[in-house]
Amino acid sequence: KNIFNKNISIELLSSKTNTGEKKTIIKNLKDNKVKMIFGTHAIFQKKIIFSNLGFVIIDEQHKFGVRQRKLLSDKGGNNCDLLLMSATPIPRTLTMSIYGDMDVSIIREKPNNRKEIITYSKLDSKIDEVVKFVKKEINNENQVFWVCPLIDVSKKIDHESVLKKFEFLDKLFPGKVALLHGKIENDEKEIILNNFLNKKYQILVSTTIIEVGIDFPNANVIIIENANKFGLSQLHQLRGRVGRGKKQANCILMLKSNLSENAKKRINILKDSNDGFVISEEDMKLRGFGDLLGFKQSGIKNFRLADPVHNEDLFILAEKEIKRIEKEETNISKYKPLLKLYDQADIINDIV
């Protein structure tokens, strides 16, 4: 609203929007009285009808499924453009980019004065070393995120919980630790986050609820429990919660001793790179690149002709050649034999 002309009607639609406001916004959208709308998953609902949807922007696109993205863009018909934004593209997205269905712009530069985040891995048995490091950071007036996968202790899953970790840390750093998770009321969450922003607390023990949408420049350490249980894109997003100020930021991945080989590879990828595209490429090699013709986000497809992992340069060259032909060639009759073969082939079974 601060950027755009005041004459442009801009609205927000989320779970917090009250019933009366929702009805008004939905009606105004349909009547073309709202020109720009910001929203959560609430926008995907069938009752949300746009008068003339021309442009969809999906931020943190890895949080949305393929069907959801298509459902939203389809609300605009054939004239709707789609912009996806993500720090870590998921494998299927990367593959579609290689195939030319998406144009990609890469912003590799960091904002001024930001340093690369240093990522370490530590075994759970080395918790004393981690606590010692945290104590030093707090003494230097820095703040810490401590992320756990569960809210409460589970008998079925051997994962760290925020309640247990909060209790542990509160004894070591009394009065300096705050607790945050999804079951806390929204108003209370905002109070906790504001108190952390204003440095009332030095440690915030949280679930992955902090993954997106927060910016605390003074927080320069994040510790992630059971890090091997998270996907690479989520770990990369969590790590991005720190390193937003001028000081050196650190990410510590807490691990069990009995890691699988695949888990070790994923952890090493994260330790070796802060580049979202590099991470997504390595993730694609590990998990597969998704079902190009369907809705699967990952999983290996056995290409007999070529595949995006090993033949990326070939696909990029082919895309350039197609664009050249479209622009320069007036007589395409010489390509008819190739087109005939394509038409006759069972393209899905012959190539995939």
Task: Give the residues covered by each predicted segment.
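Inter-lobe coupling/hinge segments of SF2-like helicase ATPases
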Residues: 1-268
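Accessory helical-bundle/CTD segments and flexible terminal tails appended to RecA-like ATPase motors
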Residues: 194-203, 210-217, 222-225, 240, ...
